[in-house]
From Swiss-Prot:
Protein name: Exodeoxyribonuclease 7 large subunit
GO CC aspect terms: cytoplasm; exodeoxyribonuclease VII complex
Annotated function: Bidirectionally degrades single-stranded DNA into large acid-insoluble oligonucleotides, which are then degraded further into small acid-soluble oligonucleotides.
Signal peptide, first to last residue: none
InterPro entries: Exonuc_VII_L, Exonuc_VII_lsu_C, OB-fold_nuc-bd_dom
Source domain of life: Bacteria
Enzyme Commission number(s): 3.1.11.6
Amino acid sequence: MKMPKNNVYTVSRLNGEVRQLLEGELGKVWLEAEISNFSAPSSGHWYLTLKDNYAQIRAAMFKGRNRAVTFRPANGQQVLVKGAISVYEPRGDYQLIIDSMLPAGDGLLAQQYEALKMKLAAEGLFAADTKRPLPSNIQRIGVVTSATGAAIRDVLHVLKRRDPSIEVIIYPSQVQGEHADKSLCHAIMQANDRMEVDVLLLTRGGGSLEDLWCFNSEALAHTIYNSALPVVSAVGHEVDTTISDYVADLRAPTPSAAAELLSQDALSKADKLRMTMTRLKQGWQHYGLKQAQRFSQLHHRLERQDPKRRLQQYEQRFDELQLRLGAALTGKLHQMERRQQSLHARLNQVSPSHQLALAASRLTHQNQRLHSAMQARLNSAEKSLQYAAHQLETVSPLATLSRGYSITLDTEGKVLHSAQDVRTGARLTTKLVDGEVQSTVI
């Protein structure tokens, strides 16, 4: 087989091209999944596995991104994440690099949104019979939005093209941030105080759920509901729906679409309006898709040249080695502890204290045996002594005396056995059972 000269890949080159292919084709994706194997090492990065019932994928969220997460992820938790597919080239593993993370389903913001929506609906703020019709001849449009945002530019561009005679008055307001809802309320009330326009357009461009959150304010909902001027809400993209959309008299999917609706009387026929709306929607979608693809390509080209990505890969590798080292050290410590316990047990078997304890036990046993033997000997000796005493008692002279006999002794204490052994005048001693009698031979 002939070896190709120009088509032989190295592993590094292959992994690099796979990474470029995945990142270039997929771009940013939204993913709903369950968290498992969650790890948060000292570097501050997060590593986890995202899974469903049939598959799983590794994921990483670096500390520059996870600082914005408002909750602590946990194993078993359902989340909604946005990120880009990437390849960790040293291992050839593909993974998801997470940019943002939200609780899925019953997340905090989603819960607040649904609770407020139900409350306002119960109060009647969404009722169809409270919606006011738009004026038939709109001459002035008041726009409540950021004076420098993309939304006002889109609105002015559409109105200029469709009906240049319509006058636009801008009521500048914050459309994002902590106090944006108060700013929006103030702008709407200012327009109602002046009463210089025919209709109000409340609008801003697209953004995340957090970016659009000021349009979900209860105070803003009541301000729109109490407005004497009709209000059109056009917040975000077509897929975004805010509380202001429900309360307003009319909802438009985008700022440009709202401008189209408000200038509809300048068109002579409804058919032309429908055709224009269709073309506008298609053109906007095509333009948005094209711009998104172009931005994604430029973004990935920039990321490939960015040393920050390489640094993140090295940090990820360092975290992995740190975890492996920690596991190895833990295993070694457990092995040493088991070895120490074994040596301690063996040392106890040969230690002097152990040997002394054994000797003391044996000595106690021997003492008990000796005491038993001595007691047995004493008992035996006592019985022998009693027997001998009995025998002596049987042959004792005292026993003879107790039967009525006596013993006669001469002056030298010798027992007299015959009368011929004494002479006249001799002194004799006669022993009786209860005493002695002195006598003289006549």
